């Protein structure tokens, strides 16, 4: 019955001239090709079936889980593997710092990915761009697993490693914003934060999977086997996860908000230029509002793993287990913060979590520096729980700052510029501060980052969308 009704409507469009007017009156433009002149199979056509909530949430979750899995296996390898295999020329401390420098490179690639993928996400559509971002990230990760080491090709090895890391950053720069929009632009009223937290859950899930596979490998393999070939397994195995993500995302249709943007001809020619020229204040404040989130997370993961297994003398396996326990608290507080955000507002929850992060900075050194297992576990659990409280509503809060026409670009840029400011140098800077001034200096680093973010959140007044987008995302 539905098929006959659609066919009848299409014939009516054709005979009335609406279905072919764009081809008769003028050549087909990019906008016309997206409208497809009433093609009922076009995902942008309003007569198409909508995505089911379960499919949307699973697609937004599975993609970010894969992307963060790929991202974190590099972070773990940058501490445990790459200093020995790709930077063996200097002492252990110098090799670790050089390895962490390649880790930081991806954060500078992420805004580039935001601009490139954001352009197509705001011009062509969310679905196709998400598929391209996933492929970029997946290919870069698999190539890392196939790289020869320094002993085989010399200085070319770290250069190729850095190039692949840059590719990872490009892919993740385009992934996060699209996944958040896929969820929030399909969300019913009053549940934007709840839907928006599903892509955020990809971070703890990806971390648990990446840490779990390294733990399994260290349990099954000898150190020699692990450093000869075992470390490559997580990178190569990510290809299977990418295929799963592609299968799920290729079955989606376009989001309702982007469909309306096409129908109302609201797309802009250069989204990144529009964001920079028309929303500069929003871009800067949004970036600073997300900075403490990045600083905290990469101190709790990359820096803590490095310092715990060197200065504190923890065995690699033991510390990875402690981190996995801490990440469980991260995963539990993400949905909790999303529920609170839908009731109290995103900004209120983010301000409360940021103030708690500032307090945490003062207890960082006593807890982590004690060396006591319970103290270290308390440090990891508390820090990562606070991370979940600030991370849960962050995606929705950043997406709400921009209208549909530039939302993919705007939200992605703010998030990934915050990655440069907050995360790119955080492990490097914390390692240097701890080595020279002690862990108290790292705690003050957290206090400073939290203070900047709190000031930005107080200054940032969430903006209502333009009237033409009043049915799209609502400010909590």
List where the protein language model places each region.
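Helix-to-loop junctions at the C-terminal end of transmembrane segments
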Residues: 114-125, 334-345
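Cytoplasmic membrane-interface "Motif A"-like loop-to-helix N-cap segments
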Residues: 123-134, 343-354
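C-terminal ends and interior cores of transmembrane alpha-helices
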Residues: 135-153, 356-370
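Multi-pass alpha-helical transporter architecture, strongest
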Residues: 245-250, 449-476
């Amino acid at each position: 019955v539905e098929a006959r009704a659609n066919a009848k409507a299409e014939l009516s469009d054709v005979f009335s001239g609406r279905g072919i007017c764009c081809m008769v009156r003028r050549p087909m433009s990019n906008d016309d090709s997206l409208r497809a002149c009433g093609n009922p199979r076009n995902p942008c056509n309003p007569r198409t079936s909508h995505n089911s909530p379960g499919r949307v949430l699973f697609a937004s979750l599975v993609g970010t889980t894969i992307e963060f899995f790929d991202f974190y296996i590099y972070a773990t390898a940058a501490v445990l593997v790459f200093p020995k295999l790709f930077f063996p020329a200097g002492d252990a401390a110098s090799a670790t710092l050089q390895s962490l420098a390649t880790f930081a490179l991806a954060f500078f690639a992420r805004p580039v990915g935001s601009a490139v993928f954001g352009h197509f996400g705001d011009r062509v559509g969310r679905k196709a761009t998400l598929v391209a971002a996933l492929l970029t990230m997946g290919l870069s990760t698999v190539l890392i697993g196939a790289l020869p080491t320094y002993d085989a090709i010399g200085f070319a090895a770290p250069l190729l490693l850095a190039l692949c890391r840059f590719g990872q950053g490009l892919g993740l720069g385009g992934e996060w914003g699209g996944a958040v929009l896929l969820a929030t632009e399909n969300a019913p009223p009053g549940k934007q934060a709840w839907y928006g937290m599903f892509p955020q859950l990809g971070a703890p899930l990806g971390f648990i999977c990446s840490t779990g596979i390294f733990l399994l490998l260290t349990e099954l393999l000898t150190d020699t086997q692990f450093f000869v070939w075992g470390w490559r397994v997580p990178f190569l195995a990510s290809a299977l996860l990418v295929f799963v993500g592609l299968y799920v995302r290729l079955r989606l249709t376009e989001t309702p908000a982007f469909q309306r943007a096409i129908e109302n001809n609201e797309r802009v020619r250069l989204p990144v230029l529009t964001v920079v020229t028309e929303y500069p204040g929003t871009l800067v404040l949004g970036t600073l509002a997300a900075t403490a989130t990045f600083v905290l997370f990469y101190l709790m993961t990359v820096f803590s793993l490095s310092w715990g297994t060197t200065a504190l003398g923890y065995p690699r396996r033991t510390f990875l287990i402690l981190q996995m326990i801490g990440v469980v608290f991260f995963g539990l507080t993400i949905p909790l913060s999303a529920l609170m955000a839908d009731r109290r507002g995103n900004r209120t929850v983010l301000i409360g979590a940021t103030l708690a992060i500032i307090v945490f900075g003062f207890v960082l050194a006593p807890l982590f520096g004690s060396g006591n297992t319970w103290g270290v576990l308390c440090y990891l659990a508390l820090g990562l729980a606070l991370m979940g409280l600030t991370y849960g509503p962050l995606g929705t809060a950043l997406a709400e700052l921009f209208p549909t026409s530039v939302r993919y670009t705007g939200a992605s840029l703010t998030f990934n510029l915050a990655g440069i400011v907050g995360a790119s140098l955080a492990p490097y800077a914390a390692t240097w501060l701890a080595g020279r001034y002690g862990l108290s200096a790292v705690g003050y680093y957290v206090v400073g980052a939290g203070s900047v973010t709190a000031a930005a959140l107080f200054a940032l007044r969430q903006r209502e969308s333009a009237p033409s987008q009043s049915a799209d995302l609502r400010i909590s």
